[in-house]
From Swiss-Prot:
PROSITE patterns: EPSP_SYNTHASE_1 (PS00104), EPSP_SYNTHASE_2 (PS00885). InterPro entries: Enolpyruvate_Tfrase_dom, Enolpyruvate_Tfrase_sf, EPSP_synthase, EPSP_synthase_CS, RNA3'P_cycl/enolpyr_Trfase_a/b. This is 3-phosphoshikimate 1-carboxyvinyltransferase. PANTHER family: AROM/DEHYDROQUINATE SYNTHASE, PENTAFUNCTIONAL AROM POLYPEPTIDE. One of its GO terms (molecular function) is 3-phosphoshikimate 1-carboxyvinyltransferase activity. Catalyzes the transfer of the enolpyruvyl moiety of phosphoenolpyruvate (PEP) to the 5-hydroxyl of shikimate-3-phosphate (S3P) to produce enolpyruvyl shikimate-3-phosphate and inorganic phosphate. It comes from Campylobacter hominis (strain ATCC BAA-381 / DSM 21671 / CCUG 45161 / LMG 19568 / NCTC 13146 / CH001A). 3-phosphoshikimate binds at K21, S22, R26, S164, Q166, D310, K337. Its main location: cytoplasm. Keywords: Amino-acid biosynthesis, Aromatic amino acid biosynthesis, Cytoplasm, Transferase.
Amino acid sequence: MKIFAQSKPLKATISNIAADKSISHRAVIFSLLSSGTNKIENFLFAEDTEHSLEIARKLGADIEIKEGIVFIDAPKKIVEPDCILECGNSGTSMRLFMGLLASVEGFFVLSGDEYLNERPMKRVGEPLCKVGAKIYGRLDGDKAPLCIQGGKLDFFKFKSKIASAQVKTALILAALNSQGCEYSEPELSRDHSEKMLKKMGADIEISGLNLKVKPLTKPLDPLEIFIPNDPSSAFYYAVAATIIPGSKIILKNMLLNKTRIEAYEVLRKMGANIKFTPKSEIYEQIGDIEISYAPLKAVEVSENISWLIDEAPALAIAFACAKGTSVLRNAKELRVKESDRIKVICEGLKCCGINVTELEDGFKITGGEAEPAIITPYGDHRIAMSFAILGLKCGMIIENSECIATSFPNFGKILKQIGANIED
């Protein structure tokens, strides 16, 4: 992908942002515990979520897609597949299915691509194994491929050392299908799972950072959901609007869950003009976000990191365009994403002539005039999209940009729609 420096403001109302990836995954996986037909509108059709759909099929789900709407009927009993369950680059697919399948009678093998198979899985596998799960993998169960000999698990209590929605959801799924659990985390991670499962009839008691999950006594009620648009995917355009003078972008039908808009709040602290307009709420609050240009100033960020971990690469681009030195800390989790994002962000910004210091748990970036560069994203969709946005300031070539399709196939199309000059 080649991006040319922008010579005019970006102005658009965008309604075709990618549907929320987190909720799309969960809608598919939770449907496997339901009875009846699940109806999922505005599903995200991207490589990551399609892996979850295909795994659900291999586990016995009847899946039909009509005019973009996904209909899922769960099997009466999850089927033991005769093949490997391929997760591609999707850590969400692998970790959530680990939790579900650890509590299901049968033998299952989960694997991913070269990048996913190097990401840590013990954070999910270890607590499950302590209560009777049988999960085997490379490096003592920390790396895929993973073999799971599923079965009913005992009641368990688990105090997580990290705020991770994937870990939390995996353990909730295992508990629902077994004897229940008590779960706590150090700070609130994304809470889509608790909200969706409670709406589907799960008995989950929420008290601050603590959950009590009771085992299912009957199948969950089927979902009927319209998935809102993804604020993480939309955030690239928000950053674009704040760094290109005169720009104004309106993002329609966005998920406004407070655990998902923290990065927008950081942009607001940096001086950006941002307005939220809530419109409706069923499973989650949905509304519009309006962003218009304003000069950005430096900021220090060290709290609620789990709420903006996916947006951190794009925030780094905002930091690079701000006046002063910005700092992100307590974000060590970035090192075990699709790439070592701390290292790759810092390498990329240095290539662009930006003064950046790599920290163990984040980075320090002094804003300045970025220079054109050729960026290698190391198979990481969020790195590729973030540097594409910086390219609007200075010009950029993103090598191997096809990785963007894992989460946001229409990214380039929408960039053109809002007035950017790019070549795929």
